[in-house]
Each structure stands twice: as C-alpha cells, then as structure tokens.
Swiss-Prot record:
It comes from Macaca fascicularis. The active site is at H71, D119, S214. Its cofactor is Ca(2+). Residues 1-16 form the signal peptide. Its main location: secreted. The lineage of its organism: Eukaryota, Metazoa, Chordata, Craniata, Vertebrata. Belongs to the peptidase S1 family. Elastase subfamily. This is Chymotrypsin-like elastase family member 1.
Length: 266
C-alpha cells in the first residue's frame, strides 16, 4: 500500500534575505490534470517498513533515465520510479514500476546551500520502460535556451493544494507563467537568492508549488510545443503561494551538456 510522507524542510540558513528557500514543492491553486495528459511525469517513491512512499516528482527523459531534483535523492534510500500513474492511491492499470539502479547527483550540489543551484540529479532505471500513450519521454529545451518573461508554463505534481492543506491523490496542474531573471532577482522578488541557472514561475499569490513534490517538471509552451524547462526546486519559507515569491526551478537548459555526458558515460 502506498503511503505519503512529507520530507523534512531543507532551509538555507545564514542567507541575507528573510525569505528562506523551502525545498519541498507541491502544486497550490491548481486543478486535477487530465488522466495521463503529462505522460513524462513520474512518481519517485522510497521503501520504508515494507511500504512505498511518494516523495518527489520527476521527468522521464530516456526509457531508462529520469531527471529529478538533487535534494530528493541526496540521502541513502531504496527508490523506485512509477510511470504512467495518475491516482497514487489506486491501481490505474497503466502504471509501470521500475527500481532505481544508479543515482547521479550533480557534483556541485550542496544540500546546505540550496541557493547555489545545481539542484538536479539523474536516475538510471534497472530496466527500460515501455513507451505508450500513458508513458512518453519529456522534451528538453535546447542548451542555453532562455524563456521570455510571461511564457505560458504549467507545474505538475501530486500533493498539497494549499499551504498546510491535504495531500492530493491525483496528479495536479497549475498555470505558472515564467518570470524572467531580471525581475525574479530584483530586491522586491527573490533578490540574490535566485541565480541565472534557475527559472522562476508564478508569484501571483494564488498558484505555486508547495511542500512535498519537488523534482517534478515545469512544462513551458515554446513555438507551439511543450518542453520541460524546469525541475521544481524551492518556494518561500513564508508560505507556498506568496506574492512576488515565484516558485523556483532548476533551469534545465543550463544542464543539457551535463545531462548528455552523464547518460553517455553511465
């Protein structure tokens, strides 16, 4: 039986801003996604006491590789990946369950300094999954691609629908338009906490990520196609849907070379 557990908060201490990052992100202010409408979305789960616990999201980028956040996997656990899922509390008949064989965390990731960036990891699966209408590979952006301000994006994930709210059992989605680096790094937003290797989205005080489903994708519409521009990283310690504190993501386009080299060498 699948159980849920919200990870302990990882807080960046000693930073100059009062708005400390909280690296547990779930979808707030969203709606239930259409069944398997985001077929590259995965559920990352770990084993404890004979039960599997959903802990993070992620993106299937090869048939045997998943992209997620480094902070999701930087403590030793037995992990598995579930693809083709929609309702975590029941068997939809479309799921595939695969063990994680190897975890590659970015070498510069520092769990004590979330604002430094590099919150990205790749998971090699024990076997390749089967692609079908419920399971597809996420499309990654070109290396160095930068989103224009206010680009249409969606965050997806399982979990809390409001700060301190109940966990959602079905996949949620929320519209989060991108916020460019110049705005997001300004003093009235995130300031120096945000780096140019990150993507900001949302910040309207209504829709956001929130505790528990980091690692999942930010899907953005560019030239008529959705691609995964972000890996959910952190939100404000003040709350999930705080105005002018957009959800912050690892910018995937900053790590394309690292992704390709890691997969090729493993």
């Amino acid at each position: 039986m699948l159980r849920f557990l919200v990870f302990a908060t990882l807080v960046l201490y000693g930073h100059s801003t009062q708005d400390f990052p909280e690296t547990n992100a779930r979808v707030v202010g969203g709606t239930e996604a259409g069944r398997n409408s985001w077929p590259s979305q995965i559920s990352l789960q770990y084993l404890s006491g004979g039960s599997w616990y959903h802990t993070c999201g992620g993106t299937l980028i090869r048939q045997n590789w998943v992209m997620t956040a480094a902070h999701c996997v930087d403590s030793p656990k037995t992990f598995r990946v579930v693809v083709g899922d929609h309702n975590l509390s029941q068997n939809d008949g479309t799921e595939q369950y695969v063990s994680v064989q190897k975890i590659v965390v970015h070498p510069y990731w520092n769990s004590n300094n979330v604002a430094a960036g590099y919150d990205i990891a790749l998971l090699r699966l024990a076997q390749s999954v089967t692609l079908n209408s419920y399971v597809q590979l996420g499309v990654l952006p070109q290396e160095g691609a930068i989103l224009a301000n206010d680009s249409p994006c969606y965050i997806t994930g399982w979990g809390r629908t409001k700060t301190n709210g109940q966990l959602a059992q079905t996949l949620q989605q929320a519209y989060l338009p991108s916020v460019d680096y110049a705005i997001c790094s300004s003093s009235s937003y995130w300031g120096s906490t945000v780096k140019n290797t990150m993507v900001c989205a949302g910040g309207d005080g209504v829709h956001s990520g929130c505790q528990g489903d980091s690692g999942g994708p930010l899907h953005c519409l560019v030239n008529g196609k959705y691609s995964v521009h972000g890996v959910t990283s952190f939100v404000s310690k003040q709350g999930c849907n705080v105005s002018r504190k957009p959800t912050v993501f690892t910018r995937v386009s900053a790590y394309i070379s690292w992704i390709n080299k890691t997969i090729a060498s493993n």
